[in-house]
Every structure is written in structure tokens, then in C-alpha cells.
């Protein structure tokens, strides 16, 4: 079974009729759409509302997305046709983002409920805002809420072929970044930590073929012995003989990689560094 089929199967086993998902990882798993990883910016343009909501209908085995119109073309390019869009960011006309979101979600939920007023609805308790809950209660007044997070965890526990390929690709991108760090450590130059970080980010994005969301830490010299994460990168100039630790996590098509390595710049490691 693919990921979506596993979710439908698990929902039916648990007696869950619908699920309303907001976790970007879960949306990617059931729909194939990778929600762009810009959480702070997304909150600004959508008034803090979810930029993408996935409605999972176990009985019909259907997925419907309710998304900001900023993602319309990206979703269409993904090949998804079952989606509706609400107007979010605009600076040229009067616009009520809250009302737009609620009306679109209400319409999509109404289609999924198909007149049924008493359904078991799965929600992600740590993600769902009250505005989304209020729409569910309005459309399905006699609904019972269950924890969809556990359903998704159960479905995702055993990886599919698509998962394995996605994780392998994310690991390849992380490797490209670490290889760039090693390459710099073998060829002396005039670098700050920030200079190296930008080169590493560029290597990761080049390997992925697109701008790659990237978090982590790069520290050099005396800061490598501290544990107050994150301590870098900073504008500190890298010196010959400096040890460095780089811990990075790129996100590629909805999958995270995590990799940490250490190098010594333009010199062999001393006894303390080896220890």
C-alpha cells in the first residue's frame, strides 16, 4: 500500500470517518503536496490561519485540500485537482482572510460530510486552531473528535517505497553540504563562518535542484566546546588549525535529513581535537 492507502485503511480500522489535517508532514504524506517551509512568513500573509488544510474522507478514499491562493499554481503543478482556494494576501483591495478561509473550509467539509451530521472526525490536537474547530462543529454538529495524530503515526511507522526514496534524497543533499565543508577545510582561504555557511547552503540547494530549507549550526574554534546550541554561524574569521562542527538538517520534498560532522581547517588535528 502507498501512504494514502495506509491512512484510509487505518482510519477505517479506528472507526474514523474524516480527518482534518494541518501538520505539513501529514499533508505531504496523504496528498503529495509539500507545504513550503516558511512558517513565520506564512503566518503573516494568512493572518495566522493554516495555509493548507487536508480533508481526508476514509469512506470515499478521497483527499481534498483547502489552500491559500498563493499556492494555487504550485498545487496544480503537483497534479492535484481536488483543491479549493481562499484569498489570503492582497494589498490592492478589501479582503477578509478569516472569512475566506472559513467559507472555503465549510464548503469542502460539507461536501465530505455529504449531509451526515454525526461523524467521527480526526484532528491533530497540537496543530488545529479554534477557527478550524468552529467550522467543523458548524458543519458536523454531532461530530465526535478523535486523535488523528496517532492514526498518521501508525500509518507512517512502516516506510513506503516513496518514503525510502524521499529520505535517501534528503540524505544525499545533506551529504553534498557536508562534502562542501570538507572541501573548504582542505583548501585554505579567507572565510568567516557565515561565508562557509552560505557555500554549504548553496551546495545543498544545487544538489536538490531548488532552494532548500536548511537549519542547523556551524561553529569553529573555541565555540566547538560549548553546548549552547545554536552558537553559529557568526562573522568569526576561521583560522588555520581551527576545529569546526557542523550539524545540519535540510528539508527536501517534505523529508528531513540530519547530519553532523567535524573538520579541522587547513591542518592536521592535534591530540586535543582527536580526543
Identify the meaning behind each predicted range.
Residues 1-176:
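A composition/biophysics-driven feature that prefers long, compositionally simple stretches
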Residues 10, 177, 203-207:
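Short alpha-helical functional segments enriched in proximate histidine and acidic residues
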Residues 30-42, 129, 147-158, 190-271:
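Short catalytic-site patches enriched in acidic/histidine residues
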Residues 120-125, 182-193:
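Conserved short loop/turn motifs at secondary-structure junctions
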Residues 135-140, 184, 199, 203, ...:
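Alpha-helical structural signal in soluble globular domains
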Residues 171-182, 193-201:
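Active-site pocket-lining segments that scaffold enzyme catalytic pockets across diverse folds
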Amino acid at each position: 500500500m502507498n501512504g494514502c492507502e495506509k491512512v484510509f485503511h487505518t482510519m477505517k480500522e479506528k472507526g474514523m470517518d474524516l480527518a482534518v489535517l494541518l501538520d505539513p508532514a501529514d499533508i505531504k504524506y496523504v496528498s503529495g503536496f509539500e507545504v513550503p517551509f516558511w512558517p513565520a512568513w506564512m503566518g503573516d500573509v494568512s493572518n495566522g490561519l493554516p495555509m493548507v488544510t487536508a480533508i481526508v474522507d476514509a469512506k470515499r478514499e478521497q483527499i481534498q485540500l483547502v489552500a491559500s491562493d498563493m499556492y494555487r499554481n504550485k498545487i496544480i503543478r503537483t497534479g492535484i485537482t481536488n483543491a479549493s482556494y481562499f484569498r489570503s494576501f492582497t494589498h490592492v483591495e478589501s479582503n477578509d482572510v478569516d472569512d475566506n478561509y472559513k467559507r472555503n473550509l465549510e464548503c469542502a467539509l460539507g461536501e465530505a460530510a455529504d449531509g451526515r451530521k454525526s461523524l467521527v472526525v480526526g484532528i491533530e490536537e497540537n496543530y488545529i486552531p479554534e477557527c478550524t474547530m468552529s467550522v467543523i462543529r458548524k458543519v458536523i454538529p454531532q461530530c465526535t473528535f478523535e486523535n488523528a495524530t496517532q492514526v498518521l503515526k501508525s500509518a507512517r511507522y512502516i516506510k513506503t517505497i516513496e518514503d525510502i526514496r524521499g529520505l535517501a534524497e534528503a540524505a544525499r543533499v545533506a551529504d553534498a553540504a557536508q562534502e562542501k565543508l570538507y572541501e573548504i577545510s582542505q583548501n585554505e582561504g579567507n572565510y568567516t563562518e557565515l561565508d562557509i555557511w552560505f557555500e554549504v547552503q548553496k551546495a545543498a540547494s544545487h544538489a536538490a535542484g531548488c532552494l532548500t530549507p536548511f537549519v542547523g549550526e556551524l561553529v569553529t574554534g573555541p565555540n566547538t566546546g560549548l553546548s549552547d546550541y545554536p552558537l553559529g554561524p557568526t562573522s568569526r574569521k576561521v583560522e588555520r588549525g581551527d576545529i569546526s562542527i557542523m550539524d545540519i538538517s535540510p528539508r527536501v520534498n517534505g523529508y528531513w535529513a540530519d547530519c553532523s560532522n567535524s573538520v579541522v581547517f587547513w591542518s592536521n588535528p592535534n591530540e586535543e581535537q582527536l580526543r
